[in-house]
Amino acid sequence: MPTPTNTIIKTSIVSNLPANFKHIGNEGTVSNGLTTQTDSIVDEISNKLASSWNTFASSVTFDNAMVIGLGIGAWVGNGVGGIFSNTELSMNATNPFTGGKAGDLTDAINSALNEQFNLWASTYLINGVSFVGTSTALPIVPGVFTANAIPMLISAAGFGTIPIGSGLKIIANLPFITPDLTSFCNAIGDAFESNFNNWLNTSQLNAGSATGPAAPGAGSGFGLSVGGTLL
């Protein structure tokens, strides 16, 4: 499944705001009930998060899982471990206005969401992903195996540190806080986490391919995976 769009993220943020949210700024409202200033900030956050998320998912590879298995002719194995080639989500929302405190807010959001996402990416390991392929080994002659991973949901293929408490992390990064800002930061954190979990549970990881020596007898062998991608 593709990464969440800016529209999906924005809708999630707005839907997580409490009914008594009094908005940031004093301008007139737009169709979703937010003030124009609040709406501009939500647009900036949604656009930058969606863009950076898509860049991560479309460019990252997953490599270096240990693949162990066996087979004469047909070869079957399992992969564990591995690492993403890039563990950096680089969201960079900026202040849509001249001056004011909105820059402190966008900086706090960038820092918290990047930290949360990148902690997951840097700790993610696959666990028992199936690799299937062929082996040239014979009962008395060594050979080589080549195998490809069977794509699995990211959440089922492995595990990493799932983001929690993102709104609180945003709040902790702010040099100032008000009740409305608390609601706003929590709405952003909740929207990020719900979209993150949906992405994990609907998108797939192709853990790549592996090749290596296959011993005579059962054709046992091991190698490191390369070229895994997010689908």
Predicted regions and their residues:
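Extracellular "spike/adhesin" assembly and maturation modules
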Residues: 1-231
